[in-house]
Amino acid sequence: MTHDNKLQVEAIKRGTVIDHIPAQVGFKLLTLFKLTETDQRITIGLNLPSGEMGRKDLIKIENTFLTEEQVNQLSLYAPQATVNRIDNYDVVGKSRPSLPDRIDNVLVCPNSNCISHAEPVSSSFAVKKRTDDIALKCKYCEKEFSHYVVLAN
């Protein structure tokens, strides 16, 4: 029996590959991080086989590179993600997200009375690591939430 080891998602010449995204999280990342607001080609692999994770999602964005801040903001959704910088089809840089002190312009406050819902302000949350959870504190209403509550919002 032979194995066909072809790439399931086409290689890119230059850009960013976000690998090892938990299955079912890829689309959420595209939306939250506004990754689709570009005219560059984006390739998405959903529920791909993974030796480590069983199944995983993958995002490839041509001619686009994530900032360190963007990479670190991925840590809430995909703490095991690997962000690869590609040039001329080769991996020229590799990074993993680490939990930032603050997450701006990405999340929505779950408090329906928060002023961030009525005013044209950018969301901003302080990140506080707990023993068994990560808490996020809204800059505007100053309420603290488990990151699971904010992510589900």
UniProtKB/Swiss-Prot annotation:
Q: Which GO terms describe its biological process?
A: 'de novo' pyrimidine nucleobase biosynthetic process; pyrimidine nucleotide biosynthetic process
Q: Which Pfam families match?
A: PyrI, PyrI_C
One GO cellular-component annotation of the UniProt record comes to: aspartate carbamoyltransferase complex
As cofactor, the record names:
Zn(2+)
| GO molecular function terms listed in the Swiss-Prot or TrEMBL record | metal ion binding
Q: Which UniProt keywords apply?
A: Metal-binding, Pyrimidine biosynthesis, Zinc
- Name the InterPro entries on file: Asp_carbamoyltransf_reg_N, Asp_carbamoylTrfase_reg, Asp_carbamoyltrfase_reg_C, Asp_carbatrfase_reg_C_sf, Asp_carbatrfase_reg_N_sf
- The organism's superkingdom is given as Bacteria
Residues the record lists as binding Zn(2+)? C109, C114, C138, C141
Indicate the transmembrane segments per the record.
none
Coiled coil spans = none
Q: What is the UniProt remark on how the cofactor binds and its stoichiometry?
A: Binds 1 zinc ion per subunit.
Q: Does the keyword Cell wall biogenesis/degradation apply?
A: no
Look up keyword Zinc and say if it applies: yes
Tell me the function of this protein.
Involved in allosteric regulation of aspartate carbamoyltransferase.
Known partners and oligomeric status: Contains catalytic and regulatory chains.
Family stated for the protein in its record: Belongs to the PyrI family.
Protein name per Swiss-Prot or TrEMBL? Aspartate carbamoyltransferase regulatory chain
Species of the source: Citrobacter koseri (strain ATCC BAA-895 / CDC 4225-83 / SGSC4696)
